Amino acid sequence: MVLVTAVRDYINRMIQDISGMKVLILDSSTVSIVSVVYSQSDLLKKEVFLVELVDSISMSKEPMSHLKAVYFLRPTSENIQHLKRQLASPRFGECHLFFSNILNDTQIHILADLDEHEAVLQVQEFYADFVAGDPCHFSLNISSNHLYMLPVAMDPSNLQHYCDRIVDGISAVFLALKRRPIIRYQRTSDIAKRIAQDTAKLMYQQESGLFDFRRSETLLLVLDRREDAVTPLLNQWTYQAMVHELIGIQDNKVDLRTFGKVPKDQQEVVLSSEQDSFFKANMYENFGDIGMNIKRMVDEFQQIAKSNQKIQTIEDMAKFVDNYPEYRRKQGNVSKHVTLVTEMSKIVEERKLMLVSQTEQELACNGGQGAAFEAVTTLLNNENVSDIDRLRLVMLYALRYEKESPVQLMQLFNKLASKSAKYKPGLVQFLLKQAGVDKRTGDLFGNRDLLNIARNMARGLKGVENVYTQHQPLLTQTMESISKGRLRDIDYPYVGNHFQPGRPQDVVIFIVGGTTYEESRSVALFNSTNSGIRFILGGTTILNSKRFLKDLEDAQRMIRSSSTVV
């Protein structure tokens, strides 16, 4: 049930069975789908000598009859139009058409009519309509991710398109896994309900034959990001999550071009658990351990190189790697990780993130409103704290104490307004309208449910291994409830008459509004406990705090510019 393997198998079947020199033609979505599971060198081994985008190849007229064209596209009307133009005067010796999802009858008829020159040798559906960045974590890379926060009446056409894309992605995941799930959703979310119902309609009515798989011990749970707005607001201190938070990961690639003196061969680096054994072993480790593990590998090479250079700091490691070009050649991966850790250390120091993060974790995990107010006020007054960190601190305080301390919250709003040029308190108030206590179902701060209160007290008494990684996403509680058969029907209703009496074997949790790498780490750790249930996490995009705040701003701007009353 590993998604990376499923997507890789589809691509293998596309390019392996077609012999000879090939051009692979993709669209803006499938280029991401392919790039996270297949490297350029992998493609060359399969005789793929050219990779082109379908919209740019439409503009070229140069004949290439020596190449066989392998198209892998989403079945959209735009792509059908591109094919219409290209098949009218074929440039390639053969055309093989693969679509990442279900073609409708109209599209099939259009394609049949287009092929006047009989250039098309096959048309197939290969259900890889999602970006499988990690074995149990996928994204749909939806750019207009803020739409889930809008009232239905505001932009019905774009919202429909947004929901359709999500249903397409979810259905492709289950077709790739050869499962038809029982479907549940978060009761307090209209958009989660809509997507759950649309998915059920597709799987149990419109395409019931296609989804007629025997095994049914599978659950799809559709959640809303606003149920836990804390997780995407926090600074991160485990490797993969920290890289995404401080630098950014897009399709398993990290762009370092804007960072000072980065070596040319490391301006863009790949972070893939499938292609990088060091990253695979360390992606969920905390920042301090990463530094030690890199140092251990540098020490090993130092012995081989018989160098006496003292290595005690991250800067020492960076200098050592620069001085030994053969080290970079032999241990390219390690020098890449030295670069990443070096750049992140600079950001941590510049933004005083150890100070900021300690207060964030206190806000997310522990009580004590008075102490929290003092700590946030002190940081708002600290000139070294950035505007984005000030905003996140006020948001975290507001999510936790909106009902308990409205007077102090107003004082923090005023302080934020005077200290931050970019961010205003209106965005915090908008967050509370979207994700405040009145909108939530679950026990986000572990202070409603008696069992959660006891658990938090026990954790406090035992002490926490790392003050910066105390927080656990709400998703962890949800997975525990599912594994114990205690996910409440009243909070997470079933769609239709399809119920699940026992525990599911496989669970796909889809978060409308996006996932985080902290949550994907929780899923991976949960899967490693051998509980008998395999979890997969998916979402509309992969968030860091910057992206989450941008989505909030985009939604707020649209609502303000509309005359619709929220």
Predicted regions and their residues:
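Extended, well-folded catalytic/binding cores that form a central cleft or groove in large enzyme
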Residues: M1-V566
